[in-house]
Amino acid sequence: MIGAGPVGLFAAHFAHLHGLSSLIFDSLSEVGGQPQMLYPFKKISDIPAYNSINGTALIQNLKSGLPKETEIITNHKVNDIKKNADGFVLDNVVLAKSIIIATGAGAFKPKELPLKMRDEIQKRVHYFIKDPKDFANQKIGVFGGGNSALDLAIELANYANVKIIHRRNEFRGLELNVKKLRSLTNVEILTPYLPKDIQLINNQLDITLKGMGDVQSRHEQFDQIVVAYGFKADNRFIKNWGIELNGTNIAVDPTMKTNIDGIYAAGDVVSYPGRVPLIALGFGEAQIAITSIMRDLFPEKTLTIHSTSI
């Protein structure tokens, strides 16, 4: 498996049900993909059997379904895939009979605050939040205007005083979240402003906010800031493996097979007509891919497709 997000983890679990062993690679420092790295505490409401579940709990549950012998290699970006008579060789080291690519939106990194900062300032500028409680009883600035910024501001407001700064008067996120923010007494909305300068003064971040249009500039002081300008995602490296892309996504057939026999894909990395980017859909695609692999590797076997077979 290439990708240790929710779809890659579930693919390894489903492979185990069919007697297949898996090795999982991920370029990130820890398992879980975007749910773990980008919104670990956000409630996800479109996973079957859960009214809601946060990203961390979802990943923990998926990890608990893996057999003990499943090996996961993090901090490793697969650079090379070669096909031979026995299957595939990844980075001239690992031999695999088949491959499932489940890299989601691809390798991603945050869009950074476009200001020059000294090291002692950068330590107080965050692009990922693991635990909102770490910001308890502090003055926090949140920069951004999309759903991620709104979600972060709402969650942080449970523990801290928050000011959310956006360059437009209108937010791009859900109106329900905007109304929620406006109802909180410890949240202040500052629009339309852009950050112009940042300094560390009296152990606080002193930020110059440039007013847009005829709005006057102002200074704000924070203990820490959180930047939610979005992320740059890139799947173009997959093309180096000889995989056919549809834009930046992998073109697959109904069995989740790519243009290369033995290489499959599942999750948000794939493209086909009518697809919607849902984790739950990726789980089903992983099951299709594993079932297809079993039929390729063991054509003589009669498969038990699912655990509810009678």
Swiss-Prot record:
<dbReference type="InterPro" id="IPR022890">
    <property type="entry name" value="Fd--NADP_Rdtase_type_2"/>
</dbReference>
<keyword id="KW-0521">NADP</keyword>
<feature type="binding site">
    <location>
        <position position="78"/>
    </location>
    <ligand>
        <name>FAD</name>
    </ligand>
</feature>
<keyword id="KW-0285">Flavoprotein</keyword>
<comment type="subunit">
    <text>Homodimer.</text>
</comment>
<feature type="binding site">
    <location>
        <position position="268"/>
    </location>
    <ligand>
        <name>FAD</name>
    </ligand>
</feature>
<dbReference type="InterPro" id="IPR023753">
    <property type="entry name" value="FAD/NAD-binding_dom"/>
</dbReference>
<feature type="binding site">
    <location>
        <position position="26"/>
    </location>
    <ligand>
        <name>FAD</name>
    </ligand>
</feature>
<dbReference type="Pfam" id="PF07992">
    <property type="entry name" value="Pyr_redox_2"/>
</dbReference>
<comment type="similarity">
    <text>Belongs to the ferredoxin--NADP reductase type 2 family.</text>
</comment>
<dbReference type="InterPro" id="IPR036188">
    <property type="entry name" value="FAD/NAD-bd_sf"/>
</dbReference>
<dbReference type="GO" id="GO:0004324">
    <property type="term" value="F:ferredoxin-NADP+ reductase activity"/>
</dbReference>
<feature type="binding site">
    <location>
        <position position="108"/>
    </location>
    <ligand>
        <name>FAD</name>
    </ligand>
</feature>
<dbReference type="GO" id="GO:0050660">
    <property type="term" value="F:flavin adenine dinucleotide binding"/>
</dbReference>
<feature type="binding site">
    <location>
        <position position="34"/>
    </location>
    <ligand>
        <name>FAD</name>
    </ligand>
</feature>
<dbReference type="InterPro" id="IPR050097">
    <property type="entry name" value="Ferredoxin-NADP_redctase_2"/>
</dbReference>
<keyword id="KW-0560">Oxidoreductase</keyword>
<feature type="binding site">
    <location>
        <position position="308"/>
    </location>
    <ligand>
        <name>FAD</name>
    </ligand>
</feature>
<feature type="binding site">
    <location>
        <position position="39"/>
    </location>
    <ligand>
        <name>FAD</name>
    </ligand>
</feature>
<dbReference type="GO" id="GO:0050661">
    <property type="term" value="F:NADP binding"/>
</dbReference>
<protein>
    <recommendedName>
        <fullName>Ferredoxin--NADP reductase</fullName>
        <ecNumber>1.18.1.2</ecNumber>
    </recommendedName>
</protein>
<keyword id="KW-0274">FAD</keyword>
